[in-house]
Amino acid sequence: MADTIFMIHGMWGGPWYWENYRRVFEGEGYRCVSATLPYHDMDPRGVPDPRLGTTSLLDYAEALEQEVRQLGAKPILMGHSMGGLLAQILGARGLAKALVLLTPASPSGIMALTPSVVRSFWSVQTKWGFWRKPMRQTFGEAVYSMLHLLSEKERKETYDKFVYESGRAAFEIGYWLFDSRGASRVDESKVTCPVLVVAGAQDRITPASVVRRVARKYKTVSTYKEFENHAHWVVAEPRWQEVAEYVGGWLRPLRTAS
């Protein structure tokens, strides 16, 4: 039976942005399953479900866990950005054969609010009560933080696909010190599977300096790879293929051993 890669998108996203990676890994014989986080299956131009605003990381993780358990054998969990944090949470629940964390958001205990991150969310966090409302970056913030290596045409096409995101989840990631439930907490001692952590040196929303600390959190099982010519959008920015190829090479020995 082919190994399964369970792909978890990040903030504002959907299964659509895994198209490149699906093509690569299905071509290598993997079964790829792309998750859709709760309340993200919507028209980007539509009105978001009001329940989205108060949806917790733990709600996302619960929904994903149900999907993963239906797969049978433990999958490779591949997460991008916030999806990378959700993969870590699921990994600590013993649900993964391996974790592939692409420019991942960091769990609690790692201070990630660098100046570039604050700028990336400026229009969101300057609105009182953002933690209980659906939210979305402005086009300028998305370009600055994630899409700056894309062409102008690609930036617009990508941004036009972005849906609203949970203000609650954003709060739990960025302001974990004030989250009484500790939604973004991950017990690294429970992550025992191999972990690949990928950073982009030009990333402004999950800076490489922060992603390195994520890798160190799992130092007994992790491999860290930083790409000098990449930023946050490693799923589709120029030369995305070299990232996918590196991931495939890292996974190959695990696949052979299975």
Model-identified regions with their sequence ranges:
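Conserved acidic catalytic loop of the alpha/beta-hydrolase fold
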Residues: D59-P75
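Active-site glycine-rich loops that stabilize anionic/oxyanionic intermediates
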Residues: G10-G13, S81, A201
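Flexible "cap/lid" loop of the alpha/beta hydrolase fold
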Residues: L95-R132, A169-F178
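Conserved alpha/beta-hydrolase
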Residues: E26-P48
